[in-house]
Amino acid sequence: MDLFNYSRRESSEVNIGATPLGGNNPIRIQSMTNTVTMDTEACVEQAKRIIDAGGEYVRLTTQGVREAENLKNINIGLRSQGYDTPLVADVHFNPKVADVAAQYAEKVRINPGNYVDPGRTFQKLEYTDEEYAQEIEKIRARFIPFLNICKENHTAIRIGVNHGSLSDRIMSHYGDTPEGMVESCMEFLRICVAEHFNDVVISIKASNTVVMVRTVRLLVKEMEKEGMAFPLHLGVTEAGDGEDGRIKSALGIGALLADGLGDTIRVSLSEAPENEIPVARKLVDYILTREGHPFIPGKEAPQFNYLSPGRRKTKAVRNIGGDNLPVVIAERLEGSFETNPQFKPDYIYCGGSVPQSRDNNIAYLVDANAWNPEDKNVYPAFNYQQMIELHHTVSDLKFLFLPYMAMNDEVIAALKLHPEVVIIAQSNHPNRLGEYRAMTHELMNEGLENPVVFFQYYQETKAEDLQIKAAADMGALIFDGLCDGIFLYNQGPLSHIVVDTTAFGILQAGRIRTSKTEYISCPGCGRTLYDLESTIARIKTATSHLKGLKIGIMGCIVNGPGEMADADYGYVGAGRGKISLYKKKECIEKNIPEDQAVEKLIELIKANGDYTEK
């Protein structure tokens, strides 16, 4: 794979009804209903809304044989109204349900974590090599008849691994690792290959964006080793709602799309399913603007490990680089210097003049020709044509605005002499990611340890568009371990506070700097038997000030306890109008009436000393 130049991965084509996937087909957009699958009319109407918004596949939960059989009626209801969009059955725990669903849906999703293996209990299991081989044989014995049903009905399948529902067998053998998630998928893929079943799509998802990106990268590598090219379905599970859900999804999915990986995507938002479609479309369309871009002559650094990157080694300059958290630089070239106390930038770039009234908790950047060494907490910012001035200026911190194409021998020599320089990387290239990677890899190849802050310029009028584009542009840089800071500049009507909040949201979604409460919330489906959206809103109202706390809000137990493995507290649907509360992986209280559960959650947080008053 070329780190610096965009091209889509070559994948095999899969026939899914009238809408094929992979190969030379466009990147497909999809969503999932959250209606009760036995309510045919509700499912048909919601599916129509998803399709009318641009959805190309519609998935429905099929928790039992009754639901699987009702897919026939839903399919008829849609086809009778002129819709030929493929339906996808989502199956967990019961392979018999998959057998039935394959007769009525164009694609069936199965979960390797609970297809044959029993549901996850977080118990350590011991196997001899012979016993482990017998477990694989059990999968073969049950899976092959299902593949035969799919062949007879021309039904495609998705092998959908979720971080939250890995089996105890895989967890015991591989641990909670990307390798375990990949092997969980490969066990099933090898059977498909042996049985000459090719209409297979694969996904590996997690709510943790770092885990999700690294695991998909590893999966592609392992498939290449075994001569497989199955198409990829991308998604970040339990991404949440609003700004958080959009940023988290765009960061994780965008990082992979930017490397040419992915044939279909689903943006999982805790909102109405049709709201997911325009977000997904904007993300795909933005990434595809890179197609056919001018060549970037980057050279990969030998110490870089794409599959498991560590943070690039840098020398700390003040509070930037080294072991410091990534910084946020904001611009205030015009308008108010107002900031949100919760999302206060570390540095403000103010162009050619420093404001008279300054915040003592913020440092300032000013153009080098306007810098006064007497100004406290103000630092000079040079452009690449001011190298002589940079040499002669005395300051313990200097900033250098630097495009990749300006990295000549003079600049490299200057950086070697001036470790106090922090680079603000700039790019006007259609593939900014490629140029930014090329720059940081050149720094590594030259043995330079200057920190790098990535400058991202936009002209957006809507907050959602800024969130999607900025997160997509920063994703791979964060997951590659290259980010010492982020500098978002939006020329348009969006307030400075919106831009600042987006920058902090991106760093939190990438798990490299925490600035607020984190919510791991699912989008809901037919298994969710309580009002998810209003519940999330009430929990956020009560807990949004608890910086650093992670709260899982899950519709059901399919991924609940697993995806909440690193959450501090969990709120999980346990039946109609009933909720179970978790502390870490431990269920503390079961079957709480829904109207009491949010208050009980707050009581649990308080009882453990993790609650502070607003």
Curated annotation (Swiss-Prot):
GO terms for molecular function: 4 iron, 4 sulfur cluster binding; 4-hydroxy-3-methylbut-2-en-1-yl diphosphate synthase activity (ferredoxin); 4-hydroxy-3-methylbut-2-enyl-diphosphate synthase activity (flavodoxin); iron ion binding. [4Fe-4S] cluster binds at C522, C525, C556, E563. Binds 1 [4Fe-4S] cluster. Coiled coil: none annotated. Its cofactor is [4Fe-4S] cluster. GO terms for biological process: isopentenyl diphosphate biosynthetic process, methylerythritol 4-phosphate pathway; terpenoid biosynthetic process. Keywords: 4Fe-4S, Iron, Iron-sulfur, Isoprene biosynthesis, Metal-binding, Oxidoreductase. It comes from the Bacteria. Pathway: Isoprenoid biosynthesis; isopentenyl diphosphate biosynthesis via DXP pathway; isopentenyl diphosphate from 1-deoxy-D-xylulose 5-phosphate: step 5/6. It holds the Pfam family GcpE. InterPro entries: Dihydropteroate_synth-like_sf (IPR011005), IspG_atypical (IPR017178), IspG_bac-typ (IPR004588), NO2/SO3_Rdtase_4Fe4S_sf (IPR045854). Its EC number is 1.17.7.3. It catalyses: (2E)-4-hydroxy-3-methylbut-2-enyl diphosphate + oxidized [flavodoxin] + H2O + 2 H(+) = 2-C-methyl-D-erythritol 2,4-cyclic diphosphate + reduced [flavodoxin]. NCBIfam families: ispG_gcpE (TIGR00612), PRK02048.1 (NF002534). HAMAP family: IspG. Converts 2C-methyl-D-erythritol 2,4-cyclodiphosphate (ME-2,4cPP) into 1-hydroxy-2-methyl-2-(E)-butenyl 4-diphosphate. Belongs to the IspG family. This is 4-hydroxy-3-methylbut-2-en-1-yl diphosphate synthase (flavodoxin). It comes from Phocaeicola vulgatus (strain ATCC 8482 / DSM 1447 / JCM 5826 / CCUG 4940 / NBRC 14291 / NCTC 11154) (Bacteroides vulgatus).
